[in-house]
Curated annotation (Swiss-Prot):
Gene: gatA
Function: Allows the formation of correctly charged Gln-tRNA(Gln) through the transamidation of misacylated Glu-tRNA(Gln) in organisms which lack glutaminyl-tRNA synthetase. The reaction takes place in the presence of glutamine and ATP through an activated gamma-phospho-Glu-tRNA(Gln).
Organism of derivation: Bacillus anthracis
Statement: the UniProt record of this protein carries the keyword Protein biosynthesis: yes
Alphabetized InterPro entries for the sequence: Amidase (IPR000120), Amidase_CS (IPR020556), Amidase_dom (IPR023631), AS_sf (IPR036928), GatA (IPR004412)
Name of this chain's protein: Glutamyl-tRNA(Gln) amidotransferase subunit A
Length: 485
């Protein structure tokens, strides 16, 4: 039995009782990485020397009264979250040798909580993708079946947890990039409310949509991690000055009287029968615990995909303009003048999907097209947000599938961008509205790959979605199933 089969609270107790050491936890992580990483390919960079030194330092503090629950816990960090002195590439060749000179706020918070960073995790380049096949280095595989994708863009973050390489990880979610891979890999992934967690030190893809969040084996562990990284940050102008409650206090298993909304659009056209049936089965479980549900409509959700790709690509076009070979990152050797420097550095450094989205965004923002595309997309975004607010006026949570289907095979959709984009039709509206949502395991498809249940909450009401997710988790055994890698 792996140490990572235990929860954070169980491991904390074992540490305090000196049944295990922090070094044991770190070595467990690196041993597992040595055993499976050649197949899974979840990591881009390991930090073994520093992690082992930190473990030795923390071993001397075991038993101290001020040791928090995350003391000594091994974590993986998505490679678009900057880490001081530890290579951060965004899985792009243009940043292949970039060593940041500061830590992201979430990394600072986790260091203050005495977690240990095991390494940086693979992803779709600049977080643009749904399968991890867009990494500029190599594709991560799904631990449940190596012929299948782990999802994206936080595929490395989800795969590392599912494979038992780390206890938990950080991902980022712009249109579903935490929840979709969590669903595909059979783990728990939360996208917090926009502004709940600082984005300072997150390399921007789409600044009005990006949000950092936790990926874990259980809902309880997820709540521990969110508790540690949440809160106002003066270094992030979009960080919200909203009190962070005690997420653990609400994990009572009680959902009696809970009002659940189920959008008909989330069980209709484009959603597979397996995903639909898994949600209906989950609703039956929650009904048996005293919750009620009704069908509702999010009428503008059918426009979410087009709206998202116009807005996110426009923001990416602006954000990625900084990668030009002048200040940092890879610089092309094929340069005769300044224009060559810009053009060749970006042409050689960016992958196809990143170029595709930059081109789309630049077009949408260009003179003569701005009103027809970008401005119109912003107006539709407001309508989508209003749809959520209207539903939440009468219901506590919204529930549906995380993805239309289970994970698909490697190479199956990589040459068809529109089919690939459609994997995110159920997660994208949440980002456009800025509300929080969690994906928890809820069954398996005919291909024996995991399915995820998406629970969506009101702005800054992560406590309620944790309560519902935990109650469902404890009433079922889906979270106890593990990839037999």
């Amino acid at each position: 039995m792996s140490l990572f089969d235990h929860s954070v609270s169980e491991l904390h107790k074992k540490l305090n009782n000196k049944e295990i050491s922090v070094t044991d936890l770190v070595e467990e992580s690196y041993k597992r990485i040595a055993d499976v990483e050649d197949n899974v390919k979840a990591f881009l960079t390991l930090d073994e020397e520093n992690a082992r030194a930190k473990a030795k330092e923390l071993d001397a503090k075991i038993g101290a009264e001020d040791n928090g629950l995350l003391f000594g816990m091994p974590i993986g960090v998505k490679d678009n979250i900057v880490t001081n002195g530890l290579r951060t590439t965004c899985a792009s060749k243009i940043l292949a040798n970039f060593d940041p000179i500061y830590d992201a706020t979430v990394v600072q918070k986790l260091k203050a909580a005495d977690t240990i960073t095991i390494g940086k995790l693979n992803m779709d380049e600049f977080a643009m993708g749904s399968s991890n096949e867009n990494s500029g280095f190599y594709a991560t595989k799904n631990p449940w079946n190596l012929d299948y994708v782990p999802g994206g863009s936080s595929g490395g973050s989800a795969a590392a947890v599912a494979a038992g390489e780390v206890l938990f990880s950080l991902g980022s979610d712009t249109g579903g990039s935490i929840r979709q891979p969590a669903a595909y890999c059979g783990v728990v992934g939360l996208k917090p409310t926009y502004g709940r967690v600082s984005r300072y030190g997150l390399v921007a893809f789409a600044s009005s949509l990006d949000q950092i969040g936790p990926i874990t084996r259980t809902v309880e562990d997820n709540a521990y991690l969110l508790q540690a990284i949440s809160g106002l940050d003066r270094m992030d102008a979009t960080s919200a000055n909203v009190e962070v409650g005690n997420y653990l206090a609400g994990l009572t298993g009680d959902v009696k009287g809970l009002r659940i909304a189920v959008p008909k659009e989330y069980l209709g056209e484009g959603v597979g029968e397996e995903a639909r049936e898994s949600v209906l089965a989950a609703l039956k479980v929650l009904e048996g615990m005293g919750a009620t549900w009704e069908e509702v409509s999010l009428p503008h959700s059918k426009y979410a995909l087009a709206t998202y790709y116009l807005l996110s690509s426009s923001e990416a076009s602006a954000n990625l303009s900084r990668f030009d070979g002048v200040r940092y990152g890879v610089r092309s050797d094929n340069v005769n003048n300044l224009m060559d420097l810009y053009k060749n550095t970006r042409s050689e450094g960016f992958g196809d999907e990143v170029k595709r989205r930059i081109m789309l965004g630049t077009f949408a923002l260009s003179s003569g097209y701005y009103d027809a595309y970008y401005k119109k997309a912003q107006q539709v975004r407001t309508l989508i947000k209003n749809d959520f607010e209207n539903v939440f006026a009468n219901y506590d949570v919204i529930i549906g599938p995380t993805t239309p289907t289970p994970a698909f095979k490697v190479g199956e959709k990589v040459d068809d961008p529109m089919t690939m984009y459609a994997n995110d039709i159920l997660t994208i509206p949440v980002n456009l509205a800025g509300v929080p949502a969690i994906s928890v395991p809820c069954g398996f498809g005919a291909n024996n790959m995991p399915l995820g249940l998406q629970i969506i909450g009101k702005h800054f009401d992560e406590a309620t979605i944790y309560r519902v997710a935990h109650a469902f988790e404890q009433a079922t055994d889906h979270h106890t199933k593990k990839a037999s890698l």
